[in-house]
């Protein structure tokens, strides 16, 4: 596996970082979730992700929204990406524990950077009738998150 670096440089004394590598979730859905939580305070983002997992709060889809219906609130199309939200919540909790280890207060921090990059594609084949096969590929995602103190 290749070494993955963070795409932005931040001050190490006032920030906390966490990363998830080659997660088996949809890149499109994880992009929409990361766009929504970027700029939120940490407790607010944690509550939002927990509500998405419980199907109480929808994530607005700006780019990949064909066939999505309108949802309550200030959004047009929205969905409930549960598996992507679970993985991003794990990364957020990891960044919170990294902040506590550094002596920072996670309740007073906000998400300055939440980005995804597509990871490698895991090739697979599903056998079909008469000796044929259909490709069944699994996409992976690399997610990076940086928390900063509120100034």
UniProtKB/Swiss-Prot annotation:
<dbReference type="GO" id="GO:0002181">
    <property type="term" value="P:cytoplasmic translation"/>
</dbReference>
<keyword id="KW-0687">Ribonucleoprotein</keyword>
<dbReference type="InterPro" id="IPR018260">
    <property type="entry name" value="Ribosomal_uL22_CS"/>
</dbReference>
<dbReference type="GO" id="GO:0003735">
    <property type="term" value="F:structural constituent of ribosome"/>
</dbReference>
<keyword id="KW-0694">RNA-binding</keyword>
<comment type="function">
    <text>The globular domain of the protein is located near the polypeptide exit tunnel on the outside of the subunit, while an extended beta-hairpin is found that lines the wall of the exit tunnel in the center of the 70S ribosome.</text>
</comment>
<dbReference type="GO" id="GO:0019843">
    <property type="term" value="F:rRNA binding"/>
</dbReference>
<comment type="similarity">
    <text>Belongs to the universal ribosomal protein uL22 family.</text>
</comment>
<dbReference type="Pfam" id="PF00237">
    <property type="entry name" value="Ribosomal_L22"/>
</dbReference>
<dbReference type="InterPro" id="IPR005721">
    <property type="entry name" value="Ribosomal_uL22_euk/arc"/>
</dbReference>
<comment type="function">
    <text>This protein binds specifically to 23S rRNA. It makes multiple contacts with different domains of the 23S rRNA in the assembled 50S subunit and ribosome.</text>
</comment>
<protein>
    <recommendedName>
        <fullName>Large ribosomal subunit protein uL22</fullName>
    </recommendedName>
</protein>
<keyword id="KW-0689">Ribosomal protein</keyword>
<dbReference type="GO" id="GO:0022625">
    <property type="term" value="C:cytosolic large ribosomal subunit"/>
</dbReference>
<keyword id="KW-0699">rRNA-binding</keyword>
<dbReference type="InterPro" id="IPR001063">
    <property type="entry name" value="Ribosomal_uL22"/>
</dbReference>
<feature type="region of interest" description="Disordered">
    <location>
        <begin position="1"/>
        <end position="25"/>
    </location>
</feature>
<comment type="subunit">
    <text>Part of the 50S ribosomal subunit.</text>
</comment>
<dbReference type="InterPro" id="IPR036394">
    <property type="entry name" value="Ribosomal_uL22_sf"/>
</dbReference>
């Amino acid at each position: 596996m290749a070494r993955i670096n963070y795409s932005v440089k931040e001050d190490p004394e006032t920030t906390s970082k966490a990363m998830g590598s080659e997660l088996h979730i949809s890149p499109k859905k994880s992009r929409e979730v990361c766009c929504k939580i970027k700029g939120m305070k940490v407790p607010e983002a944690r509550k939002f992700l927990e509500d998405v997992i419980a199907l109480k709060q929808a994530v607005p889809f700006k780019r990949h929204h064909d066939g999505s219906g309108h949802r309550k609130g200030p959004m047009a199309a929205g969905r409930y990406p549960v598996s992507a939200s679970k993985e991003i919540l794990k990364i957020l909790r990891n960044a919170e524990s990294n902040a506590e280890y550094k002596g920072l207060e996670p309740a007073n921090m906000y998400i300055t950077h939440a980005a995804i990059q597509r990871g490698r594609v895991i090739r697979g084949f599903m056998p079909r009738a008469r000796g044929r096969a259909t490709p069944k590929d699994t996409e992976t995602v690399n997610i990076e998150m940086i928390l900063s103190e509120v100034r």
